[in-house]
């Protein structure tokens, strides 16, 4: 029965050498092998069980062990390995799963008598062994070499694609990295340096590359870091700059891959060997598809004896319930240990000499070995008892060992020394009263070796913490509580944030028990010096999360597969016809083998009417467990008692009931037919309404917009947009290349020009440096060449060429030109970037507009149903196809009408001749474009673009370029042919549709004509019909069936015709699409050519405009300079002449003062005619400058202020008096603030004239100076020049001592010597009228030698002053402007007429306008009136008068003060 079991125990018949029994313990003793081994024939190895050497006579040998041929070995490992063999033991001992068995004496202090000297033969190997090694230790070691250590698989690089390099480069880098590092995971610095130096980059660049690549700062490079270094080297080699910091995307990719490599554990599992009796621990785990890798221990542990012992599972050495007891011949000499009795652990009922090997247990002198007596194991024996050399070990402290997959929770090799500081951490984090007051983190930190996975003890501590804080048993801990717990660890806030992120992957804001354990474990690792990982390693993923993710993935896969199946079978359109079951199954792995497979559910239920049966008495409820009761006896008796008459009566009643049922059925059939006809009529009416609505939609003006949602067109437009978007970078790069070439050409052209302009300059040196730069060697060669040329010229007698230019000047010129070229290039580059950005934004907007928004599965289903006629009846399908054909026909017609109207508009547009209204037709046509086809829109866009180009070229004065590829007539002919073709197709479709409609109407009429006959022939009379009616109904049914067959045949024929028509339409549609695509390509080519020509023309226009502007600016500059020079010369000459005339006039006046004795009253009356006549006579020789005044006259005539036409010249002349811009600004400000009427209009009128050309003050001043020579030689404006400086009262008070007196005179009228002098001066000029008039102008000119510019105002008032000045004062109501005008016009306006003949007639009317405005009298009469009484005092002040006349300002001040005293002047005039 057990004959074959020995093959698994390594015996003689063992067919698997090298595979010992699982977990068998070899003997261990301090004695030689010869003394331990007792010859025996059993199949077990002797096994010590007990203490050291004792007296052999004290204990009775106890037989233990099993017979070789009848007993199976006992398994103490994983319980699921050999369950059948364990069940075959006859009442034997059953080892409980995972239950360690102790075969020695419990640990206690050992008396000295038991001490045994340690042997020297103790094996020194204490390293842990795997289960395979322990199993191999039981086999024969002769000729069987120990298994070789697993070969290193080399550096493992994760199969992760780096986005910043290509796949080919990554493969090359992987090969290079593996060849450089061998079996290591990292590349040391020296090897990396050797590889990086091959790039021949400078050391500074390689240093930057190393700093950026070594992300871990470890002095070594992982593969992703090495790939990053290669990528950066490639960047630098290609000429691009290195980034200061790595982009976040690259940094995250490199860090993630480094973490994956760091967390990875090499797979050291040996190869699968032949099947042995060793139980397979992986069998129950085969279904786990996502087993995590083995955990990586940061620091390897040196296993201890306790660990070694704990890895060995004890074996039962016999059957448990066996008789034990002391043998009668055993003396009690054990002392305190006398209670231990030898126990019989063998198989009772067998001869000890035959089957069992004696095995003493308890205290004995020589431990006897039991077990298999086979070949010696190749490994040292393992101790299983309390040996003398292990006296210091405590065998009681055995640690439970993992029996699952490494890396799972609670199954990790904990450190031998335990987890330090874990209890302190627990006490620190436990909820305590008064913890708010503060806490200390002392004693929490350390440097212990902590694995990635969570041990059982650690998990238990964390669970206790969780339960302690989860007082309400919610199953989770909130964020606030977690902050309080984790904050007591003393870690930084950033580390705690990262730990929380890792522990709460779903971002729920709370932690369950497993997630809390993960957080605490990470905190514990951080306190012991381990960094917080960037991502959670597989060992720390909670089982609940892992299982949930697997479940979710399985559900998703099931749903996706179900959706794919339904989509492929069309189940989502007709769910009841697919046979797909929608019953919810609770098993993810059941599939077709699940118990519920094949059974029908409610989603597929269909009632089987034929299976329905009538009443069965056997289906009644049975009473109790008895058999079916018999029918009631009463009914049997009643049936037996019925007579013949009663039976006949029952038959008649039954017949009546059957006839009534037939009648009801026929009535119901009629009602159903009526309802069917009504429904059919309603459906037809609905279809008619639908047709009418569709026709209204097709004929509506805005019907074109509904075609915008065409999916095919959207996709075509998206593809076209993508093609254009792909061309943008190419065009931009081409533009940049052309810009570089232009810049280089400009620089080279400048070098050539500079070399031609400066022959001996250093600019003609040809640079040999990078980029054509001139190096120092080039300069040295050029200087040497120049010296040689100079020597050659000296020897030849030629003059030595002098170097008029040095190296610095040439370099500066070249640098300036390079800077300007660079600036232009940067500006163009910025424009290019702006264009790219705008194109990108426009592309994004187009993409957003082309996206199919709101496209859900329900909407897709409905659209396919009603637009593609899927999942509907045949009648509805035909109706939908009919509507689509009608829509296409109407669309073609509308398109032709819109095109015809557009052509009419285009023909009418040029005839109208209005270029500005041209966009209106294009806007109108654009409104109808969305409804038209793609080709029409392209053609319309091309036409609009050509029209805009023609308008721009016409505006620029260029002749538009006509496209010679296709003339207008050819294009019109082609479009006409296409239009006729489309009309013909539309008419054919209309004819087909009409024929179909007529055929359908004829069929309906036939069906309606046949339909009434059926109910007439079938409807019976009201009386109960006979049974014959059933045969008639059967005949009618056959007729119906024949009619249905004919209808079906006709319908099949119609479907075939419709199908052929659809195929023909599809072929026609494909042909039209191909033609449209060809036309579109042709149009695109034409558009590109047109755009190229347009760009060239625009560039020519722009260059022409620039040249014209440059020429115009140069001409204006030359004219302005010439005018300025001419004006300056004319002003100087006029000033000299005025000074001479003024001086002569003053001399004559002084002589006249001595000779004249006229009264003061006569002076004012005679001054006005005296001033007017000589001024006119004086203007005769100076009329020559009147010609250039036409421009100012036209400007002044066009000014809005015509009423004060004479004020502008005054202001203009006053402004040209000073060339200081600050004085002009202050003077204008003072003029605007003066309250007196005369100066008010001057700045107001002057400022608009100055602003006509430019707002720049310097430009305006230049214009004023350029107009100076136009107004030279005007004598009568010298009084105006005296009146002008009154605005300078407060600014030029330091001019002379008379200015202060003038200021006083402003305050008190009639006082001051200046007024007296002026009255004396003007009074003495009365008798010699012509002479005094001429002298009056000369002294006035000489009195203003510095401010000569008032003369320039002369020509301007001549035309305006002679005609409009006298009429200007009376009309305007406001006093200030008229006051200013008559104040000048009464005395000065009559003198300056443009022509001498006009002056005498204009002189007499001048006094009449003077009296009406008393507030504004003429300035000359006013001083004598105000200073009339003190006139005699003027004689002694002649020297002061001359000084004031020479000063100029004082004399003008007098006149200004006289104007302010308008009341006295009015009295004098009266």
From Swiss-Prot:
Give the main localization category.
Answer: membrane
Please state the gene responsible for encoding this protein.
Answer: pan1
Lineage per the UniProt record: Eukaryota, Fungi, Dikarya, Ascomycota, Pezizomycotina
Q: Which residues form the WH2 domain?
A: 1437-1454
- Keywords, in A-Z order: Actin-binding, Cell membrane, Coiled coil, Cytoplasm, Cytoskeleton, Endocytosis, Endosome, Membrane, Repeat
Q: What is this protein called?
A: Actin cytoskeleton-regulatory complex protein pan1
Q: Does the keyword Nucleotide-binding apply?
A: no
Query: GO CC terms for this protein?
Result: actin cortical patch; endosome membrane; plasma membrane
Query: Spans of biased composition, class Basic and acidic residues?
Result: 809-864, 892-910, 933-951, 971-1006, 1052-1087, 1099-1127, 1134-1146, 1277-1286
Function noted in UniProt: Component of the PAN1 actin cytoskeleton-regulatory complex required for the internalization of endosomes during actin-coupled endocytosis. The complex links the site of endocytosis to the cell membrane-associated actin cytoskeleton. Mediates uptake of external molecules and vacuolar degradation of plasma membrane proteins. Plays a role in the proper organization of the cell membrane-associated actin cytoskeleton and promotes its destabilization.
């Amino acid at each position: 029965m057990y004959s074959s079991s020995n093959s698994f125990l390594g015996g003689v018949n063992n067919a698997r050498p090298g595979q010992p029994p699982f977990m068998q313990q070899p003997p261990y003793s301090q004695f030689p092998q010869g003394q331990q081994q007792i010859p025996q024939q059993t199949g077990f190895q002797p096994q010590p069980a007990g203490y050291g050497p004792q007296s052999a006579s004290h204990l009775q040998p106890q037989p233990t062990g099993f017979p070789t041929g009848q007993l199976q070995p006992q398994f103490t490992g994983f319980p699921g390995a050999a369950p059948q063999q364990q069940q075959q033991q006859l009442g034997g001992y059953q080892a409980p799963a995972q239950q360690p068995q102790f075969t020695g004496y419990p640990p206690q202090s050992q008396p000295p008598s038991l001490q045994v000297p340690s042997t020297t033969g103790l094996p020194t190997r204490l390293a842990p062994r795997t289960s395979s090694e322990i199993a191999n230790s039981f086999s024969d070691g002769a000729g069987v070499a120990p298994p070789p250590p697993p070969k290193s698989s080399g550096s493992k690089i994760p199969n992760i694609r780096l986005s910043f390099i290509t796949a080919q480069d990554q493969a090359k880098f992987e090969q290079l990295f593996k060849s450089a590092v061998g079996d290591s995971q990292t590349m040391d610095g020296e090897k990396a340096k050797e590889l990086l130096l091959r790039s021949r980059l400078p050391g500074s660049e390689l240093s930057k590359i190393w700093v950026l690549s070594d992300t871990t700062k470890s002095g070594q490079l992982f593969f992703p870091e090495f790939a990053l270094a290669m990528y950066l080297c490639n960047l630098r080699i290609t000429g691009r700059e290195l980034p200061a910091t790595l982009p976040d995307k690259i940094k995250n990719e490199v860090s993630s891959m480094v973490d994956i490599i760091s967390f990875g554990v090499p797979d050291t599992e040996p190869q699968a060997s032949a099947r042995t009796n060793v139980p397979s621990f992986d069998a129950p785990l085969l279904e786990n598809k996502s087993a995590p890798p083995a955990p990586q221990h940061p620091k390897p542990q040196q296993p201890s004896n306790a660990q070694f012992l704990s890895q060995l599972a004890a074996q039962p050495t016999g059957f448990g319930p066996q008789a034990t007891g002391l043998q009668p011949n055993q003396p009690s000499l054990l002392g305190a240990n006398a209670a231990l009795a030898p126990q019989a652990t063998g198989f009772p009922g067998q001869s000890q000499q035959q089957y069992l090997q004696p095995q003493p247990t308890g205290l004995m002198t020589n431990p006897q070995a039991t077990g298999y007596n086979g070949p010696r194991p190749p490994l040292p024996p393992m101790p299983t008892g309390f040996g003398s050399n292990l006296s210091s070990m405590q065998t009681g402290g055995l640690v439970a060992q993992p029996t699952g997959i490494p890396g799972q929770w609670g199954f990790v090799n904990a450190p031998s020394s335990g987890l330090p500081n874990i209890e302190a951490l627990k006490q620190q984090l436990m909820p305590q009263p008064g913890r708010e007051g503060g806490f200390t983190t002392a004693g929490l930190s350390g440097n212990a070796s902590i694995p990635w996975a969570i041990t059982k003890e650690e998990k238990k501590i964390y669970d206790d913490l969780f339960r302690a804080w989860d007082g309400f048993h919610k199953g989770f801990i909130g964020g606030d509580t977690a902050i309080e717990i984790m904050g007591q660890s003393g870690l930084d806030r950033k580390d705690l944030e990262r730990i929380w992120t890792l522990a709460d992957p779903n971002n729920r804001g709370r932690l369950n028990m497993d997630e809390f354990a993960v957080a605490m474990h990470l905190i514990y690792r951080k306190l012991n010096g381990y960094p917080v990982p960037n991502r959670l390693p597989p060992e720390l993923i909670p089982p609940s999360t892992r299982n949930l993710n697997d479940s979710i993935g399985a559900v998703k896969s099931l749903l996706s597969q179900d959706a794919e199946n339904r989509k492929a079978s069309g189940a989502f359109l007709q769910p009841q016809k697919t046979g797909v079951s929608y019953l919810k199954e609770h098993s993810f792995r059941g599939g077709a083998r699940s118990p519920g497979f094949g059974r029908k559910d409610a989603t597929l239920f269909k009632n089987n009417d034929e299976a329905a049966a009538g009443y069965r008495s056997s289906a009644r409820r049975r009473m109790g467990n008895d058999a079916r009761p018999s029918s009631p006896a009463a009914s049997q008796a009643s049936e037996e008692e019925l007579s013949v008459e009663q039976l006949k009566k029952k038959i008649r009643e039954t017949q009546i009931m059957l006839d009534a049922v037939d009648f009801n059925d026929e009535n119901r059939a009629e009602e159903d037919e009526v309802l069917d006809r009504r429904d059919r009529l309603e459906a037809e009416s609905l279809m008619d309404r639908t047709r009418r609505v569709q026709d209204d939609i097709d004929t509506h003006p805005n019907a074109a917009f509904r075609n915008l949602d065409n999916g095919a067109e959207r996709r075509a437009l998206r593809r076209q947009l993508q093609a254009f978007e792909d061309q943008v970078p190419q065009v931009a790069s081409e533009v940049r290349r052309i810009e570089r070439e232009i810049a280089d050409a400009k620089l080279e052209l400048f070098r050539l020009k500079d070399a031609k302009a400066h022959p001996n300059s250093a600019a003609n040196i040809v640079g040999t440096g990078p980029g054509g730069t001139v190096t120092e060697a080039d300069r040295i060669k050029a200087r040497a060449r120049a010296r040689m040329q100079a020597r050659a010229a000296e020897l030849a007698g030629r003059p030595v060429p002098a170097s008029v230019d040095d190296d610095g000047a040439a370099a500066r010129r070249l640098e300036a030109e390079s800077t300007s070229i660079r600036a232009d290039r940067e500006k163009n580059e910025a424009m290019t970037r702006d264009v790219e950005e705008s194109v990108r934004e426009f592309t994004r907007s187009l993409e957003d507009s082309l996206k199919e928004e709101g496209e859900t599965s329900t909407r897709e289903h409905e659209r396919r149903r009603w637009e593609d006629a899927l999942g509907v009846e045949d009648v509805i399908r035909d109706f939908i196809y009919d509507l689509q054909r009608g829509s296409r026909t109407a669309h073609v017609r509308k398109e032709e009408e819109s095109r015809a109207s557009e052509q009419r508009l285009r023909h009418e547009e040029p005839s109208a001749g209005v270029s500005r209204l041209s966009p209106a037709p294009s806007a109108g046509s654009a409104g109808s474009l969305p409804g038209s086809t793609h080709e029409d829109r392209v053609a319309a866009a091309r036409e609009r673009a050509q029209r805009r180009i023609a308008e721009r070229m016409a505006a620029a004065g260029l002749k538009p370029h006509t496209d010679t590829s296709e003339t207008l007539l050819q294009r019109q002919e082609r479009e006409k042919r296409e239009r006729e073709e489309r009309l013909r197709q539309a008419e054919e479709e209309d004819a087909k549709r009409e024929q179909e409609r007529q055929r359908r109407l004829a069929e309906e009429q036939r069906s309606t004509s046949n339909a009434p006959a059926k109910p007439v022939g079938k409807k019976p009379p009201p009386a109960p019909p006979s049974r014959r009616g059933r045969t008639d109904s059967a005949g009618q049914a056959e007729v119906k069936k024949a009619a249905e067959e004919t209808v079906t045949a006709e319908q099949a024929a119609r479907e075939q015709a419709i199908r052929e028509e659809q195929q023909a339409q599809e072929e026609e549609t494909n042909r039209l699409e191909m033609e449209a695509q060809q036309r579109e390509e042709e149009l695109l080519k034409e558009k590109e050519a047109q755009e190229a020509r347009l760009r060239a023309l625009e560039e020519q226009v722009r260059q022409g405009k620039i040249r014209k502007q440059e020429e115009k600016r140069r001409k204006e500059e030359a004219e302005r300079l010439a005018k300025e020079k001419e004006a300056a010369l004319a002003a100087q000459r006029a000033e000299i002449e005025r000074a001479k005339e003024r001086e002569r006039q003053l001399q004559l006046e002084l002589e006249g003062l001595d000779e004249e004795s006229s009264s003061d009253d006569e002076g004012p009356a005679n001054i006005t005619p005296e001033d007017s006549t000589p001024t006119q006579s004086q203007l005769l020789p100076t009329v020559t400058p009147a010609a250039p005044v036409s421009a100012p006259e036209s400007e002044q005539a066009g000014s809005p202020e015509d009423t004060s036409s004479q004020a502008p010249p005054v202001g203009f002349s006053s402004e040209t008096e000073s060339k200081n811009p600050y004085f002009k600004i202050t003077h204008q400000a003072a003029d605007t603030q003066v309250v007196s009427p005369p100066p008010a209009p001057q700045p107001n009128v002057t400022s608009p004239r100055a602003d006509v050309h430019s707002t720049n003050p310097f430009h305006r001043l230049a214009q004023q100076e350029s107009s100076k020579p136009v107004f030279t030689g005007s004598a009568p404006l010298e009084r105006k020049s005296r009146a002008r400086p009154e605005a300078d009262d407060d600014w030029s008070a330091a001019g002379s001592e008379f200015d202060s007196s003038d200021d006083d005179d402003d305050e008190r009228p009639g006082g001051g010597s200046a007024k007296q002098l002026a009255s004396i001066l003007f009074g003495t000029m009365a008798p010699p009228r012509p002479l005094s008039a001429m002298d009056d102008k000369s002294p006035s000119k000489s009195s203003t030698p510095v401010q000569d510019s008032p003369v320039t105002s002369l020509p301007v008032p001549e035309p305006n002053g002679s005609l409009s000045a006298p009429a200007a004062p009376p009309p305007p109501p406001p006093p200030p402007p008229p006051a200013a005008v008559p104040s000048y016009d009464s005395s000065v306006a009559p003198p300056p007429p443009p022509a001498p003949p006009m002056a005498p007639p204009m002189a007499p009317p001048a006094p009449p306008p003077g009296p009406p405005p008393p507030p504004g009298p003429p300035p000359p009469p006013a001083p004598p009136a105000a200073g009339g009484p003190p006139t005699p005092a003027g004689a002694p002040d002649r020297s002061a008068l001359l000084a004031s006349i020479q000063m100029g300002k004082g004399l003008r001040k007098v006149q200004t003060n006289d104007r302010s005293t308008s009341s006295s002047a009015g009295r004098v005039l009266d």
